[in-house]
Structures are given as C-alpha cells and as structure tokens.
C-alpha cells in the first residue's frame, strides 16, 4: 500500500510508534478513576516544564476550542473586539466574543479574498478603540490564508 503525505488539517499522519500506542485499549476518561491521577500528574509536569506555579490545564477538543478559550480568557463584559471576518472561523469569533459578554465589531471581506492591508489601515484610522482583534491565519473552510506578517503589526 502506498502511503501519501496528508497535508490537511486532519487526519494527520503520525509516526509508527504513535500508531502502535493508539492501538492499545483505552478507557472512558470520564469514568476511569486512574485517569484523574494521570491527568493531574501530567498537568503538574507541564507546570514544572513551563516554570510556573499557576495551575495548568490541558484542553481536549477540536481546534476551535482554542479559539473559544482565547476569547474566554481575553473578553470581559462590554469589551469591543475587532473580529476579522473572511471565513467561517473568523466569523465564529463574533459568537464567542458575544458569549463572554463582549461586543464584536466585524471587519468583513468577501470569503474569496484575503484582507487588504491598506483598506484595514484606513479602517483603523477611523475606528481603533478595541481591546483586542481576532484574526484567523488560515480559515480552512474558505481556504483563505491571511498574511499575518502584514496584518498583525496594524492590530
């Protein structure tokens, strides 16, 4: 059988030893008492690795969970947040901002086009009072790749 390199967001290819490890029987972490000890120990080891005394948590979920976690961490009631919308994930930030009490301000473009740096610069000259901006580098549903090296310095 020919093995092709898979270059999509998922599923991803893994090394053979990882495939073998994943073939081992596993339990439901919600019901397995041993999992709690394993999880706690792993979080503590990550805290040591990061030289932090703060509590470390491992979030298990789809990639979009990271986007929501960022909004949950950064957004406070009434915060104005610039949501850069040129794809489904970009637009999705607006829902997360709203969910956590913020006021999303959408800066949208056609889903077939990356953001125009000059147009964004002109927009920000008129309205720039935002706590933070939400921008997706590669919005996979639309296939849009945003040039963060040029956009982020403006934000």
Predicted segments with their positions:
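Short beta->alpha junction loops
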Residues: 108-113
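A glycine-/small-polar-enriched, mobile loop at the entrance of the PLP active site in fold-type I
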Residues: 2-60, 64
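Active-site-proximal loop->helix
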Residues: 92-105, 118-119, 123
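Conserved beta-loop-alpha segment that forms the PLP phosphate-binding cup at the N-terminus of a helix
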Residues: 53-95
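Structural motif
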Residues: 84, 107, 135-136
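Generic recognition of short, well-ordered alpha-helical segments
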Residues: 17, 95, 145-147
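Active-site phosphate-binding strand-loop segment of PLP-dependent enzymes
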Residues: 115-155
